[in-house]
């Protein structure tokens, strides 16, 4: 595999259509978008087959944690939108079968009680969330007099870089263990903690991981930290071979007690999550606030930047390719 060239995000953006297979109708495909507060967004294409395999990955690592995604009661805490008529009643969630889907947008000192009351009432076996979504709740819980009486197996976090400070506070506040999941929108790698270790187990059925130095060479024996290069197995529609993820991984030399012969990462170093301030002066994680908009086709958006000078209002700067300038109202529609 070392004879293949390394693919960068910029190269993908400039040659996007060349990476999509030609023998399928593009209208039948699904697309998702990568990015951050200052970044060049990338549209990643896939089909239903990849989506099924992606779901199977979740089922697999949850089974490794002795959890059943179909039967176990759980809470999802992300940037989901909740109907206004519910918000007006201090209900910031919807219930679907054995799952409560909560919105992280409304967590503050005034609403904390309602979130905690619902969590206590529902008694989930696990909570699935982003670090930046659960952290404000953990912080408020840690500072207050309200205590939860739960029997949580885990809090499972993904989608962002998890700091040691976040892990420690979340575990302390909820009296349970945090399981970190590593993945990315491009879908070439999935890694997870296990019952015996917080080290990330890179699932071999999903793709190949390489850790390379600044000269794109394999790490020397004594060096543990390198850029993560991913080769995915499951996305026939949009194959990625030796893709530079932009993440930095720290190699682990231990053999995990779980017995799985996976490549292990001690940790992944990434960008600490950014926040914006809403009208009520609450900190809102910027990733779910912006990147719920996967309906947008970001092709033609070379770069974007998010700036906030006034609470409750953000300015999005778009650097568009010349052809897309004619269609800029299409993009602006989604940000109103």
Give the location of each predicted region.
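Nucleotide 5′-phosphate-binding alpha/beta core
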Residues: 1-33, 39-72, 121-128, 148-150, ...
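Glycine-rich, histidine-containing beta strand-loop boundary motifs that form or position
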Residues: 45-47, 78, 130-131, 182
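Active-site glycine/GP-rich loop and adjacent strand/helix microenvironment
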Residues: 94-336
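Short, solvent-exposed polar/charged micro-motifs at secondary-structure junctions
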Residues: 2-6, 84-86, 189-192
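A short secondary-structure junction signal
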Residues: 44-46, 88, 240-242
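Gly/Ser/Thr-rich beta-alpha loop segments that engage phosphate groups in nucleotides
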Residues: 38-41, 81, 161, 185
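Conserved AMP-binding loop of ANL adenylate-forming enzymes
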Residues: 59, 63-94, 102-105, 159
């Amino acid at each position: 595999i070392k004879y293949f060239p390394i693919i960068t995000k910029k190269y993908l953006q400039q040659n996007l259509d060349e990476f999509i297979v030609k023998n399928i109708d593009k209208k039948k495909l699904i697309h998702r978008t990568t990015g951050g507060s200052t970044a060049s967004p990338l549209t990643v294409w896939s089909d239903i087959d990849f989506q099924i395999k992606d779901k199977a990955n979740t089922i697999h690592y949850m089974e490794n944690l002795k959890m059943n995604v179909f039967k176990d009661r759980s809470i999802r805490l992300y940037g989901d939108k909740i109907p206004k008529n519910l918000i007006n009643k201090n209900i910031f969630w919807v219930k679907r079968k054995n799952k409560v889907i909560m919105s992280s947008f409304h967590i503050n000192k005034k609403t904390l009680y309602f979130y905690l009351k619902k969590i206590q009432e529902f008694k989930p076996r696990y909570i699935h969330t982003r670090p930046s979504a659960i952290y404000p709740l953990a912080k408020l819980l840690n500072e207050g007099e309200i205590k939860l009486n739960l029997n949580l197996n885990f809090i499972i976090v993904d989608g962002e870089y998890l700091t040691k400070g976040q892990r420690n506070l979340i575990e302390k506040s909820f009296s349970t263990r945090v399981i970190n999941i590593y993945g990315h929108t491009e879908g070439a790698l999935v890694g997870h903690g296990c019952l015996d270790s917080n080290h990330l187990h890179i699932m071999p059925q999903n793709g190949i991981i390489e850790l390379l130095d600044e000269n794109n060479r394999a790490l020397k024996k004594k060096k543990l930290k390198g850029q993560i290069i991913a080769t995915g197995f499951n996305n026939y529609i949009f194959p990625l071979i030796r893709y530079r993820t932009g993440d930095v991984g720290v190699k682990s030399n231990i053999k995990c007690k779980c017995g799985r012969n996976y490549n292990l990462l001690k940790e992944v170093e990434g960008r600490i999550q950014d926040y914006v301030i809403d009208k009520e002066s609450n900190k809102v994680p910027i990733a779910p606030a912006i990147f719920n908009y996967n309906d947008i086709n970001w092709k033609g958006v070379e770069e974007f930047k998010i700036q906030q000078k006034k609470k409750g209002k953000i300015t999005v700067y778009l650097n568009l390719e010349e052809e897309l300038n004619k269609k800029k109202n299409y993009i602006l529609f989604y940000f109103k």
